[in-house]
From Swiss-Prot:
Residues that, per the record, bind Zn(2+) 1: 70, 72, 85, 88
MF (Gene Ontology): DNA binding; DNA-directed RNA polymerase activity; magnesium ion binding; zinc ion binding
Organism: Xanthomonas axonopodis pv. citri (strain 306)
One GO term of the biological process aspect: DNA-templated transcription
Positions that bind Zn(2+) 2: 814, 889, 896, 899
Protein name per the record: DNA-directed RNA polymerase subunit beta'
Reaction(s) catalysed by this chain's protein: RNA(n) + a ribonucleoside 5'-triphosphate = RNA(n+1) + diphosphate
One term under GO cellular component: DNA-directed RNA polymerase complex
Cofactors: Mg(2+); Zn(2+)
A Pfam entry, by short name: RNA_pol_Rpb1_5
Self-association and partners: The RNAP catalytic core consists of 2 alpha, 1 beta, 1 beta' and 1 omega subunit. When a sigma factor is associated with the core the holoenzyme is formed, which can initiate transcription.
Binding site residues for Mg(2+): 460, 462, 464
Keywords recorded for this protein, A-Z: DNA-directed RNA polymerase, Magnesium, Metal-binding, Nucleotidyltransferase, Transcription, Transferase, Zinc
Entry note: cofactor: Binds 1 Mg(2+) ion per subunit. Binds 2 Zn(2+) ions per subunit.
Amino acid sequence: MKDLLNLFNQQRQTLDFDAIKIALASPDLIRSWSYGEVKKPETINYRTFKPERDGLFCAAIFGPIKDYECLCGKYKRMKHRGVVCEKCGTEVTLAKVRRERMGHIDLASPVAHIWFLKSLPSRIGLMLDMTLRDIERVLYFEAYVVTEPGLTPLERRQLLTEEQYLTARQEYNDDFDAAMGAEAVYELLRTIDLQSEMTRLREEIASTGSETKLKRLTKRIKLIEAFLESGNRPEWMVMTVLPVLPPDLRPLVPLDGGRFATSDLNDLYRRVINRNNRLRRLLELNAPDIIVRNEKRMLQESVDALLDNGRRGRAITGTNKRPLKSLADMIKGKQGRFRQNLLGKRVDYSGRSVITVGPYLKLHQCGLPKKMALELFKPFVFAKLQRRGLATTIKAAKKLVEREEAEVWDILEEVIREHPVLLNRAPTLHRLGIQAFEPVLIEGKAIQLHPLVCTAFNADFDGDQMAVHVPLSLEAQLEARALMMSTNNILSPANGEPIIVPSQDVVLGLYYMSRALENKKGEGMVFANTSEVKRAYDNRVVELHAKVKVRITQVDVEAGGKRSSGTSIVDTTVGRALLSEILPEGLPFQLANTEMTKKNISRLINSSYRLLGLKDTVVFADKLMYTGYAYATRAGVSIGIDDMLIPDEKKGILTEAEAEVLEIQEQYQSGLVTAGERYNKVVDIWSRTSERIAKAMMDTIGTEKVENAKGETIDQKSMNSLYIMADSGARGSQAQIRQLAGMRGLMARPDGSIIETPIKANFREGLNVQEYFNSTHGARKGLADTALKTANSGYLTRRLVDVAQDVVITEIDCGTTEGLIMTPIVEGGDVVEPLRERVLGRVVAEDVYLPGNDEEPIVTRNTLLDEAWVAKLEDASVQSVKVRSTISCESSFGVCARCYGRDLARGHQVNIGEAVGVIAAQSIGEPGTQLTMRTFHIGGAASRAAAVDNITVKTTGSVKFNNLKSVAHASGSLVAVSRSGELSVLDGHGRERERYKLPYGATITAKDGDAVKAGQSVANWDPHNHPIVSEVAGFIRFIDFVDGVTVIEKTDELTGLASREITDPKRRGAQAKELRPIVRIVDAKGNDLTIPNTDLPAQYLLPPRSIVNLQDGAAVGVGDVVAKIPQEASKTRDITGGLPRVADLFEARKPKDPAILAERSGIISFGKDTKGKQRLIIKDTDGSEHEELIPKYRQIIVFEGEHVTKGETVVDGEPSPQDILRLLGVEPLAAYLVKEIQDVYRLQGVKINDKHIEVITRQMLRKVEIVDQGNSKFLNGEQVERQRVIEENARLVKRNELPAKYDPVLLGITKASLATESFISAASFQETTRVLTEAAVRGTRDNLRGLKENVIVGRLIPAGTGLAYHAGRRKASGLTDSEMETLSGKPAVAEPVAAVADAGADEE
């Protein structure tokens, strides 16, 4: 009622707006906001608690304290609404205007705004082209600045010290103006003529040659352009009027005992007003200059503190020595306005409690304590009580509820029926952390949770708590039921596999009932149907694990929904037959006729979802759970100390290993191996031993000898409880059992390096003191890591969400033909990820043909590949498929459904409006806590087993070489002379089954295309030495070999052979630094030979530490080893693993010593070395050269005369993503990022779909750098959104003008988030001050396109169900095309958009 009467007096309400603009406020604007000037620093009268007149809480300025009542009490009541009391000056209106009415302070002297002064780059400094130090000297009265030189030789903006100023005054009298303080800066800014300055700068840019100058000029041009375009004036960066925040936003609350609690802002404002008034008085009194100056400086400092305390000098502190919270602190940081109150708010109608198991619940239910439900649904209960006539008023209803009368509970039951509630468990790392359930009222005080959703919530019942929220509106209930119900979220959005999968007890029960054992009671019986089996089992005629034959009726459901059934007799076990009773109709029994390990159960649920759909699967999952619990109870599996069987072979294996270690120790003492080699070998031996013992132990625990029905003794999988648990995937893993019953093995120190003495005991035998001490090292590090990891992982997720938050599906098809080429991932002998898994759920970009048949495509363009299509591709043994990808999507905002493909959580093509960016960020961030924190050291056993020295193929097939260069050795085998060579094994269909890297110098025993058998060795090499291989036959000639200077003669004690080692140039004398030991190969007459097919001499530069075993003049054949470089010499480089690695990749950080890639294709040669660098020259086909200086310590992995292609590695190391983008382009970069990130996750056994990484990569690539501005409005070197450039270029081409040329730029996720078009989104992420300063200067408008901006301004997000709302809003506002164009700043599209894409098309 009150608000209704207030209709006429409402403050300007802005409900409907399309964009928000931020700009500098002019003094006039500030005055127009203000309701009066605050003249006194007083707040409220301590006796009457009434605000003082003209003070910081003045009622005349800001409005009345009580609704419709003036301060002195002359006017009370509604009838005087709008009257201004003549006695106290208060307007009679609502008290809440005190939250919105502002005041102002007229400053006696101008004050520079600290944000525009100190926030780097300093805007005032750029504008005036002065350094920040100089401006500060002027502002804080340490120097004069010339504001108007007149006819004097002084320069404008020249700084003068006190002495210089006085001298100048004497010399030129009043011919020039100079001043100090903010007035001077204000004057300088006011007199800038932006337009002419702009013209002058453009001319200067054209004429200048220096890089640094160009950068500075470009920056200034951009700033001045921004001022011109936004209509801001430069002098507004210096304030003459200060706005005062409404008093209710900086409250002053009386506490008991006559003290007050106040907002820090009041203190800061008080200081400003005090100093301002004092300055005014001093000016009126014509006080001496020095006093006035000091007061002005203090005023400047107090305004600085009010705006951003602590930005300059020491922060002003309050009574408790704590810095006061300034206006800037109010909005930034986790506790600031953006993150604390706008992006996340506390809500009503919510409660939290501990969770317990609800094993009897259905999947869509949760147990809600009655007490809690009553409190949450109170208003609903009140309403119903009134409607039933059980209570006449709300008050009466309240009494009934408080007394908890019987009828209240009945009514609560009705209210709750089919009203879903949301359950949330913190931390909510992905969208499955909030799901909807139908509540079931229960006694007790704990919420009951269905066991199958625990995986999604990552919940366990050791004291976890969950929060309950009630969706109130009908729409909210609808969304909760249709989108968030636990039964609608069976698949994980990260990888499309079921997430409602039984674990632990349930798996154990299902595994136990589906195991087959030999010679059990009833083996060999034949049953007519499953119910007969059940009868037999209940009557104890057969045992659960007995192998029997059963007639099973099988129903097949075809794609059209047609059903056909048939019966067959199946070999199975009693348990599996019982399991078949709960299988839904249409699910093939053979899926369940196996051991039900966790993997198999997951496969079962997945198949059920794909074949039969959602409803059947949900019912099935529930049945599986009930059955699992029932049989786990029956099995009564538990572990005891006797289950940990220690293998008998352990002793022998350990003795062997100890002998080996002793031998290496002796070799080390006699100087045959270096300390590093000894350590590596010892660690290698122990990790091998640990593996052997583990294998022996698994054999001991996992098998047992039994008699079968025929009386023969055979091995079968044992029913050892420990083994059952690990084998089924219920709990524990081989690694853990190995510690219980094998040997604990090697331990790591906190820095990740490995202690070379292993722990030989296991927990069953017990550790001695030293072993225990060694193991505490790593364990403590583990705990410290976990704490750090959680925080880091959360921060990574936050950055990912921020960079991708505005990626939404906006249209069906963008029409691009681009895409990524997908091939299976093969590492070593294993196909890590087959093609079918990589392309499942993607859309084909180009028709796919059978290998070697170009007539009839198997799959046509724009087909969404589902399970059936993928199987077809596999049958046709297709090796690579080009699929659409978000990286190449051409939609102007968001991405299109075709480029994204299947919605992983639903299994069909993604819907328009799906917020795929946030889903991608959550999918990558959520497993972050499972990744390790530590960096692995290569050369330790933890990283992998012993060094590989040969290739033994695992499958039968044919050999194929990939970009391998080789020479034929006299012995008939080939020797590899390229570094990037690879050997693959293809099966009969030409599909790649294995792929191996062939190192330089490897001897290859098979030829290209040869047939090989499984187990055959096809290549071998020396892993500890890097050879240098001769590519021609001839005689050796040494060059620059000076004994004792460049080479040292060594004689091997054992063999007596002499060898020469090249010395390190650093250790040589000055005159020998230039000598370069080379082995050249000459013919019998001594003429230089050349490398075949080139005109380069056959000579090999020997790096330091290399060893030559041949004598000068010795004969060599093709493929012979001329020299070798001990591999131990190459430093073991750390590889970063886990979370830090993922963060580095997403932040696009350059690695420490990045690999150097060839800048162009051509032939390698080496030029003259400089002091610490070697000169590498690449000469391309047309004879132009590119040279690169490379530090001496880096390993160059190419040789003189070798041909390299652009982007190939020439110096070993981790490639930098920026180089890949620059030299190879976007697709290889995407492939590299996806591969590297997936490697980290795969190591932890986490599955993430490539799509998600691609979505993030797309966001990292959204900016481009202008290389040639053409006739566009951009400047060279400027970074612009790709979309902006494309639009601008389209406009220019239409007018037949020169479009701008650009290169893609890779930004890290933090940089990319801060560089988004929306300043609201960027400001709420990080560096709030910098973002807002930048935006204000540019007069940026935020079109509220992303999700975050809309949440902040309090609207529905433009995604999901909100997409239609936004489209409707735009239609309702009835904007014409041209108006739309002015709003969005881009041309309105003329051609009609497809009806389906309508919602998206309006999403400009």
